[in-house]
């Protein structure tokens, strides 16, 4: 198969194995705060709340969100200043056994519900993206093979199946073995159906060509007969 004619979408499935992370806007929604407030707290309490970055963007874990929720309790419920809240954090970090971070049960439950909803949405997005990518790869492969000659069709499709199987196996390994089997069965069924359609089209084309040849022969014979008649009458009137 021509390497340039077959391209696959690069799918990143790292989220299947890694802990879910959240953006600043998502954290702001979970904690019911403005994004600017979340960024301000992150800067003020960076010595106590360690948040990873991806480029210039922060990636919040569940633990980070819990720490920010505790910080919100200190500032909004206990009415502490930034410096007082920093001292509370310092005390917690230096003597963790004597201090615990307490957040109201109602707010914790609400945050847990939002977090669970966000996690389900992310998993659903991953699932949809995976299915869309696989569907796109199959449709592109079939469309490409339909435009090739009959002799190259089977060879090209077999190569495509091998590459698809290797690609999917290398990307998602054991987690999608069942999907690979279903995909192979789908491609086999599609191949059989495609071959039938191509043969049907080919047979119709042959029949059409034969009919056209027959029609041309009949027209040729009619023209010859008319020419013969014209020649006969021409000779008759010249006498």
UniProtKB/Swiss-Prot annotation:
Residue ranges of the region described as Disordered: 217-239
Region (Required to bind TubZ): 138-239
UniProt-listed GO biological process terms: plasmid partitioning; regulation of DNA-templated transcription
Record flagged with keyword Coiled coil: yes
Biased composition (Basic and acidic residues): 217-228
InterPro entries: DNA-bd_dom_put_sf (IPR009061), MerR-type_HTH_dom (IPR000551)
Subcellular localization: Host cytoplasm
Coiled-coil boundaries: 150-229
GO terms for MF: DNA binding
Covalent S-S links between cysteines: none
Major localization listed first in the record, in broad terms: host cell
Cellular component per GO, a single term: host cell cytoplasm
Keywords: Coiled coil, Host cytoplasm, Plasmid partition
Bias kind Low complexity: ranges: 229-239
Note: This bacteriophage also exists as a circular plasmid prophage in its host.
Subunit structure of this chain's protein: Forms homooctamers in the absence of the last 13 residues; the coiled coil domain is required for oligomerization. In the presence of GTP and Mg(2+) binds to TubZ and also to TubZ-TubR-tubC DNA; the latter is reshaped from large filament bundles to rings of 30-40 nm diameter.
Function: A probable TubZ filament regulator that is part of the type III partition system presumably used to ensure correct segregation of this bacteriophage. Binds to TubZ in the presence of GTP and Mg(2+), and to TubZ-TubR-tubC (tubC is the centromere-like site). The latter complex is reshaped from large bundles to rings by TubY. Modifies TubZ filaments formed in the presence of GDP to make them thinner and more flexible; in GDP and lacking the last 8 residues of TubZ makes rings without TubT-tubC.
Annotated domain remarks: The coiled coil domain is required for oligomerization and for binding to TubZ, but the C-terminal 13 residues are not.
The protein's name in its UniProt record: Regulator protein TubY
Originating gene: tubY
